[in-house]
Amino acid sequence: MSLESVRYSRGSLQVLNQLLLPHKSEYEPVTGVQQGADAIRTMKVRGAPAIAIVGVLSLAVELTSRTCQDVPSFIAFVQESLCHLVDARPTAVNMKKAADELNAFLAKEAEKAGATTQGLAESVIQWAEALLKKDVEDNQMIGDFGAKHILETAGPTEKVCMLTHCNTGSLATAGYGTALGVVRSLHVLGRLSHVFCTETRPYNQGSRLTAYELVYEKIPATLITDSMASAAIRDRKVTAVVVGADRVVANGDTANKIGTYQLAITARYHGIPFYVAAPSTSCDLSLPTGGSIVIEERPSHELTDINGVRIAAPGIGVWNPAFDVTPHELITGIITERGVFKPEELRDGLTKGQ
Protein backbone atom coordinates (compact mmCIF):
# COMPACT_ATOMS: atom_id res chain seq x y z
CA MET A 1 0.00 0.00 0.00
CA SER A 2 1.32 3.44 -0.96
CA LEU A 3 1.74 6.33 1.40
CA GLU A 4 -0.96 9.01 1.38
CA SER A 5 -0.26 12.74 1.50
CA VAL A 6 -3.97 13.42 2.01
CA ARG A 7 -6.93 11.58 3.48
CA TYR A 8 -10.27 12.82 2.28
CA SER A 9 -13.93 11.98 2.70
CA ARG A 10 -16.87 14.30 2.14
CA GLY A 11 -16.57 17.09 4.73
CA SER A 12 -13.23 15.88 6.12
CA LEU A 13 -9.64 16.51 5.00
CA GLN A 14 -6.44 15.47 6.72
CA VAL A 15 -2.91 16.15 5.49
CA LEU A 16 0.22 14.28 6.45
CA ASN A 17 2.50 16.81 8.13
CA GLN A 18 5.62 16.25 6.05
CA LEU A 19 7.67 18.53 8.28
CA LEU A 20 7.68 15.73 10.86
CA LEU A 21 8.86 12.96 8.54
CA PRO A 22 10.62 10.59 8.74
CA HIS A 23 10.54 10.61 12.53
CA LYS A 24 6.81 10.95 13.00
CA SER A 25 3.79 10.17 10.83
CA GLU A 26 0.99 12.51 11.85
CA TYR A 27 -2.13 13.57 9.97
CA GLU A 28 -3.56 16.99 10.77
CA PRO A 29 -7.13 18.13 10.08
CA VAL A 30 -7.76 20.89 7.54
CA THR A 31 -11.17 22.41 8.16
CA GLY A 32 -11.12 25.21 5.60
CA VAL A 33 -9.29 27.45 3.20
CA GLN A 34 -7.14 29.28 5.75
CA GLN A 35 -5.76 26.06 7.19
CA GLY A 36 -5.24 24.74 3.67
CA ALA A 37 -3.24 27.82 2.68
CA ASP A 38 -1.21 27.62 5.89
CA ALA A 39 -0.39 23.94 5.27
CA ILE A 40 0.79 24.83 1.76
CA ARG A 41 2.77 27.92 2.79
CA THR A 42 4.57 26.20 5.67
CA MET A 43 5.24 23.13 3.49
CA LYS A 44 3.38 20.68 5.66
CA VAL A 45 2.18 19.61 2.24
CA ARG A 46 4.31 20.20 -0.86
CA GLY A 47 4.70 19.06 -4.42
CA ALA A 48 2.84 20.91 -7.17
CA PRO A 49 0.05 18.33 -7.69
CA ALA A 50 -0.52 17.88 -3.95
CA ILE A 51 -0.68 21.65 -3.42
CA ALA A 52 -3.55 21.91 -5.89
CA ILE A 53 -5.34 18.91 -4.41
CA VAL A 54 -5.12 20.21 -0.85
CA GLY A 55 -6.12 23.69 -2.01
CA VAL A 56 -9.35 22.72 -3.75
CA LEU A 57 -10.25 20.10 -1.15
CA SER A 58 -9.82 22.64 1.67
CA LEU A 59 -12.35 24.80 -0.17
CA ALA A 60 -14.66 21.81 -0.63
CA VAL A 61 -14.53 21.01 3.08
CA GLU A 62 -15.34 24.60 4.03
CA LEU A 63 -18.27 24.67 1.62
CA THR A 64 -19.91 21.70 3.37
CA SER A 65 -20.66 23.92 6.37
CA ARG A 66 -20.54 27.48 5.02
CA THR A 67 -23.64 29.37 3.94
CA CYS A 68 -23.78 32.41 1.65
CA GLN A 69 -26.74 34.75 1.28
CA ASP A 70 -26.92 34.66 -2.50
CA VAL A 71 -25.17 33.47 -5.63
CA PRO A 72 -23.00 36.61 -6.12
CA SER A 73 -21.66 36.40 -2.56
CA PHE A 74 -20.98 32.68 -3.02
CA ILE A 75 -19.00 33.32 -6.20
CA ALA A 76 -17.07 36.13 -4.52
CA PHE A 77 -16.15 33.84 -1.61
CA VAL A 78 -14.90 31.10 -3.93
CA GLN A 79 -12.86 33.56 -6.00
CA GLU A 80 -11.27 35.15 -2.92
CA SER A 81 -10.51 31.73 -1.45
CA LEU A 82 -8.82 30.54 -4.62
CA CYS A 83 -6.70 33.70 -4.84
CA HIS A 84 -5.56 33.13 -1.27
CA LEU A 85 -4.60 29.54 -2.04
CA VAL A 86 -2.71 30.49 -5.21
CA ASP A 87 -0.71 33.12 -3.33
CA ALA A 88 0.43 30.58 -0.72
CA ARG A 89 3.16 29.26 -3.09
CA PRO A 90 3.07 30.94 -6.50
CA THR A 91 5.76 29.07 -8.46
CA ALA A 92 3.85 25.78 -8.68
CA VAL A 93 1.36 26.28 -11.51
CA ASN A 94 -1.09 23.49 -10.62
CA MET A 95 -2.97 25.52 -8.01
CA LYS A 96 -3.27 28.49 -10.38
CA LYS A 97 -4.58 26.30 -13.19
CA ALA A 98 -7.04 24.59 -10.86
CA ALA A 99 -8.26 27.99 -9.66
CA ASP A 100 -8.75 29.27 -13.20
CA GLU A 101 -10.59 26.13 -14.29
CA LEU A 102 -12.78 26.07 -11.19
CA ASN A 103 -13.68 29.76 -11.57
CA ALA A 104 -14.66 29.16 -15.21
CA PHE A 105 -16.68 26.09 -14.25
CA LEU A 106 -18.45 27.98 -11.47
CA ALA A 107 -19.32 30.88 -13.77
CA LYS A 108 -21.04 28.51 -16.20
CA GLU A 109 -22.90 26.72 -13.42
CA ALA A 110 -24.09 30.04 -11.98
CA GLU A 111 -25.56 31.06 -15.34
CA LYS A 112 -27.90 28.08 -15.38
CA ALA A 113 -31.55 28.75 -14.64
CA GLY A 114 -32.47 28.20 -11.00
CA ALA A 115 -28.89 28.20 -9.71
CA THR A 116 -28.71 28.25 -5.90
CA THR A 117 -25.85 28.58 -3.44
CA GLN A 118 -26.50 25.06 -2.19
CA GLY A 119 -26.45 23.62 -5.70
CA LEU A 120 -23.30 25.54 -6.61
CA ALA A 121 -21.57 24.34 -3.45
CA GLU A 122 -22.36 20.75 -4.39
CA SER A 123 -21.01 21.32 -7.90
CA VAL A 124 -17.74 22.77 -6.57
CA ILE A 125 -17.32 19.91 -4.11
CA GLN A 126 -17.86 17.33 -6.84
CA TRP A 127 -15.39 19.16 -9.08
CA ALA A 128 -12.73 19.03 -6.35
CA GLU A 129 -13.37 15.35 -5.68
CA ALA A 130 -13.01 14.57 -9.39
CA LEU A 131 -9.64 16.36 -9.42
CA LEU A 132 -8.42 14.09 -6.61
CA LYS A 133 -9.39 10.95 -8.53
CA LYS A 134 -7.90 12.19 -11.81
CA ASP A 135 -4.54 13.03 -10.26
CA VAL A 136 -3.96 9.42 -9.21
CA GLU A 137 -5.00 8.14 -12.64
CA ASP A 138 -2.74 10.65 -14.42
CA ASN A 139 0.23 9.71 -12.25
CA GLN A 140 -0.17 6.03 -13.07
CA MET A 141 -0.19 6.90 -16.77
CA ILE A 142 2.95 9.01 -16.32
CA GLY A 143 4.67 6.08 -14.62
CA ASP A 144 3.68 3.65 -17.36
CA PHE A 145 4.59 5.95 -20.26
CA GLY A 146 7.91 6.89 -18.66
CA ALA A 147 8.96 3.34 -17.86
CA LYS A 148 8.08 2.11 -21.35
CA HIS A 149 9.97 4.99 -22.99
CA ILE A 150 13.11 4.51 -20.90
CA LEU A 151 13.15 0.77 -21.58
CA GLU A 152 12.95 1.29 -25.35
CA THR A 153 16.71 1.89 -25.42
CA ALA A 154 17.53 -0.97 -23.03
CA GLY A 155 18.05 -4.62 -23.88
CA PRO A 156 15.08 -7.04 -23.64
CA THR A 157 15.92 -8.03 -20.07
CA GLU A 158 18.32 -5.25 -19.12
CA LYS A 159 17.70 -3.43 -15.87
CA VAL A 160 18.17 0.32 -15.56
CA CYS A 161 19.68 2.50 -12.84
CA MET A 162 17.94 5.83 -12.20
CA LEU A 163 18.73 9.06 -10.36
CA THR A 164 16.04 11.38 -9.03
CA HIS A 165 15.85 14.65 -7.11
CA CYS A 166 13.59 16.11 -4.42
CA ASN A 167 10.33 14.23 -3.70
CA THR A 168 7.92 13.36 -6.48
CA GLY A 169 6.12 10.32 -5.13
CA SER A 170 2.88 9.70 -3.28
CA LEU A 171 3.79 12.41 -0.78
CA ALA A 172 3.95 15.06 -3.54
CA THR A 173 0.73 14.05 -5.28
CA ALA A 174 -2.64 12.48 -4.58
CA GLY A 175 -0.95 9.11 -5.07
CA TYR A 176 1.63 7.06 -7.03
CA GLY A 177 3.80 10.03 -7.98
CA THR A 178 5.32 11.58 -11.10
CA ALA A 179 9.09 11.05 -11.44
CA LEU A 180 9.02 8.59 -8.56
CA GLY A 181 6.01 7.02 -10.26
CA VAL A 182 8.26 6.25 -13.22
CA VAL A 183 10.75 4.64 -10.83
CA ARG A 184 7.91 2.71 -9.19
CA SER A 185 6.66 1.44 -12.56
CA LEU A 186 10.16 0.26 -13.52
CA HIS A 187 10.36 -1.58 -10.20
CA VAL A 188 6.96 -3.24 -10.71
CA LEU A 189 8.12 -4.41 -14.15
CA GLY A 190 11.23 -5.94 -12.58
CA ARG A 191 13.46 -3.71 -14.69
CA LEU A 192 14.91 -1.38 -12.03
CA SER A 193 18.33 -2.30 -10.71
CA HIS A 194 18.70 0.70 -8.40
CA VAL A 195 17.71 4.31 -7.85
CA PHE A 196 19.83 7.08 -6.35
CA CYS A 197 17.99 9.90 -4.60
CA THR A 198 19.59 13.22 -3.68
CA GLU A 199 19.13 14.64 -0.19
CA THR A 200 17.88 17.90 -1.79
CA ARG A 201 19.22 20.65 0.42
CA PRO A 202 18.25 22.84 2.09
CA TYR A 203 14.82 21.38 2.87
CA ASN A 204 15.98 17.78 2.54
CA GLN A 205 12.92 16.48 0.72
CA GLY A 206 15.06 13.69 -0.69
CA SER A 207 16.48 12.41 2.58
CA ARG A 208 13.34 13.05 4.64
CA LEU A 209 10.65 12.07 2.15
CA THR A 210 11.90 10.23 -0.94
CA ALA A 211 14.14 7.92 1.07
CA TYR A 212 11.17 7.30 3.38
CA GLU A 213 8.95 6.34 0.43
CA LEU A 214 11.58 4.13 -1.18
CA VAL A 215 12.19 2.20 2.04
CA TYR A 216 8.43 1.91 2.59
CA GLU A 217 7.96 0.54 -0.95
CA LYS A 218 11.02 -1.76 -0.65
CA ILE A 219 12.57 -0.26 -3.78
CA PRO A 220 16.39 -0.72 -3.98
CA ALA A 221 17.77 2.75 -3.36
CA THR A 222 20.74 4.75 -2.14
CA LEU A 223 20.71 8.25 -0.68
CA ILE A 224 23.43 10.66 -1.83
CA THR A 225 24.21 14.31 -1.15
CA ASP A 226 23.43 16.78 -3.92
CA SER A 227 27.15 17.26 -4.58
CA MET A 228 27.65 13.53 -5.24
CA ALA A 229 25.34 13.38 -8.27
CA SER A 230 28.02 13.73 -10.97
CA ALA A 231 30.20 11.09 -9.34
CA ALA A 232 27.23 8.74 -8.98
CA ILE A 233 26.29 9.14 -12.64
CA ARG A 234 29.85 8.33 -13.73
CA ASP A 235 30.89 5.71 -11.20
CA ARG A 236 27.59 3.92 -10.53
CA LYS A 237 26.52 3.76 -14.19
CA VAL A 238 23.26 5.69 -13.93
CA THR A 239 21.06 5.07 -16.99
CA ALA A 240 18.94 8.22 -16.81
CA VAL A 241 17.86 11.09 -14.58
CA VAL A 242 14.15 11.69 -13.97
CA VAL A 243 12.80 14.65 -12.00
CA GLY A 244 9.43 16.29 -11.43
CA ALA A 245 8.32 19.83 -12.21
CA ASP A 246 6.51 22.69 -10.58
CA ARG A 247 6.00 24.45 -13.90
CA VAL A 248 6.82 23.57 -17.50
CA VAL A 249 6.33 26.40 -20.00
CA ALA A 250 5.54 26.34 -23.72
CA ASN A 251 9.10 25.87 -25.00
CA GLY A 252 9.85 23.14 -22.42
CA ASP A 253 11.85 25.25 -19.95
CA THR A 254 11.15 23.73 -16.55
CA ALA A 255 11.03 25.16 -13.04
CA ASN A 256 11.72 22.51 -10.44
CA LYS A 257 13.39 22.15 -7.07
CA ILE A 258 16.67 24.02 -6.73
CA GLY A 259 19.49 21.77 -7.92
CA THR A 260 17.60 20.39 -10.92
CA TYR A 261 19.46 22.61 -13.39
CA GLN A 262 22.86 21.29 -12.36
CA LEU A 263 21.61 17.71 -12.71
CA ALA A 264 20.57 18.44 -16.29
CA ILE A 265 24.02 19.86 -17.01
CA THR A 266 25.84 16.84 -15.62
CA ALA A 267 23.48 14.44 -17.39
CA ARG A 268 24.26 16.16 -20.69
CA TYR A 269 28.01 16.03 -20.00
CA HIS A 270 27.86 12.31 -19.25
CA GLY A 271 25.65 11.56 -22.25
CA ILE A 272 22.62 10.16 -20.43
CA PRO A 273 18.96 11.16 -20.85
CA PHE A 274 17.39 13.77 -18.59
CA TYR A 275 13.61 13.48 -18.23
CA VAL A 276 10.97 15.69 -16.63
CA ALA A 277 7.87 13.85 -15.40
CA ALA A 278 4.86 16.08 -14.90
CA PRO A 279 1.09 16.01 -15.43
CA SER A 280 -0.38 18.38 -18.00
CA THR A 281 -1.66 20.44 -15.06
CA SER A 282 1.97 21.40 -14.38
CA CYS A 283 2.41 22.68 -17.94
CA ASP A 284 1.80 26.39 -18.45
CA LEU A 285 1.54 27.05 -22.18
CA SER A 286 0.69 30.70 -21.54
CA LEU A 287 4.35 31.46 -20.78
CA PRO A 288 6.70 31.28 -23.77
CA THR A 289 9.96 30.75 -21.85
CA GLY A 290 11.22 30.04 -18.36
CA GLY A 291 12.38 33.61 -17.97
CA SER A 292 8.80 34.56 -17.11
CA ILE A 293 8.48 32.14 -14.20
CA VAL A 294 8.29 33.74 -10.76
CA ILE A 295 10.79 31.96 -8.50
CA GLU A 296 9.83 31.71 -4.84
CA GLU A 297 12.52 32.58 -2.30
CA ARG A 298 12.39 30.90 1.08
CA PRO A 299 13.43 32.19 4.53
CA SER A 300 17.15 32.25 5.32
CA HIS A 301 16.79 30.08 8.43
CA GLU A 302 15.96 27.07 6.23
CA LEU A 303 19.58 27.21 5.08
CA THR A 304 21.31 28.38 8.25
CA ASP A 305 19.46 26.21 10.79
CA ILE A 306 18.67 22.51 11.12
CA ASN A 307 15.96 21.51 13.59
CA GLY A 308 16.35 24.86 15.32
CA VAL A 309 20.13 24.56 15.65
CA ARG A 310 22.17 27.16 13.80
CA ILE A 311 24.94 25.68 11.65
CA ALA A 312 26.14 28.84 9.85
CA ALA A 313 28.07 31.83 11.14
CA PRO A 314 25.80 34.66 12.34
CA GLY A 315 25.82 37.58 9.94
CA ILE A 316 26.42 35.58 6.76
CA GLY A 317 24.22 36.54 3.81
CA VAL A 318 21.82 33.93 2.44
CA TRP A 319 20.27 33.38 -0.98
CA ASN A 320 17.63 30.67 -0.83
CA PRO A 321 15.59 30.24 -4.03
CA ALA A 322 13.24 27.27 -3.80
CA PHE A 323 13.47 26.50 -7.52
CA ASP A 324 15.66 26.91 -10.58
CA VAL A 325 14.82 26.81 -14.28
CA THR A 326 16.29 24.13 -16.53
CA PRO A 327 16.58 25.24 -20.18
CA HIS A 328 14.67 23.05 -22.62
CA GLU A 329 17.86 22.34 -24.57
CA LEU A 330 19.02 20.12 -21.69
CA ILE A 331 15.78 18.12 -21.45
CA THR A 332 15.53 14.83 -23.36
CA GLY A 333 11.81 14.38 -22.90
CA ILE A 334 8.81 15.51 -20.88
CA ILE A 335 6.75 12.60 -19.56
CA THR A 336 3.04 13.40 -19.19
CA GLU A 337 -0.17 11.41 -18.83
CA ARG A 338 -0.64 11.92 -22.59
CA GLY A 339 2.73 10.55 -23.65
CA VAL A 340 6.41 11.48 -23.78
CA PHE A 341 7.28 14.60 -25.77
CA LYS A 342 10.46 16.34 -26.77
CA PRO A 343 10.36 19.94 -25.49
CA GLU A 344 9.60 21.27 -28.97
CA GLU A 345 6.69 18.81 -29.27
CA LEU A 346 5.08 19.70 -25.95
CA ARG A 347 2.61 22.38 -27.07
CA ASP A 348 1.26 20.32 -29.98
CA GLY A 349 1.19 17.18 -27.86
CA LEU A 350 -0.91 18.77 -25.13
CA THR A 351 -3.26 20.74 -27.39
CA LYS A 352 -3.89 18.07 -30.02
CA GLY A 353 -7.55 17.13 -30.12
CA GLN A 354 -8.68 20.06 -27.97
From Swiss-Prot:
Pfam families given in the database record: IF-2B
The protein's annotated pathway: Amino-acid biosynthesis; L-methionine biosynthesis via salvage pathway; L-methionine from S-methyl-5-thio-alpha-D-ribose 1-phosphate: step 1/6
Active-site residue list: D246
Record-marked site positions (Transition state stabilizer): C166
Known catalytic reactions: 5-(methylsulfanyl)-alpha-D-ribose 1-phosphate = 5-(methylsulfanyl)-D-ribulose 1-phosphate
Subcellular location: Cytoplasm; Nucleus
EC assignment: 5.3.1.23
UniProt function note: Catalyzes the interconversion of methylthioribose-1-phosphate (MTR-1-P) into methylthioribulose-1-phosphate (MTRu-1-P).
Family: Belongs to the eIF-2B alpha/beta/delta subunits family. MtnA subfamily.
Protein name: Methylthioribose-1-phosphate isomerase
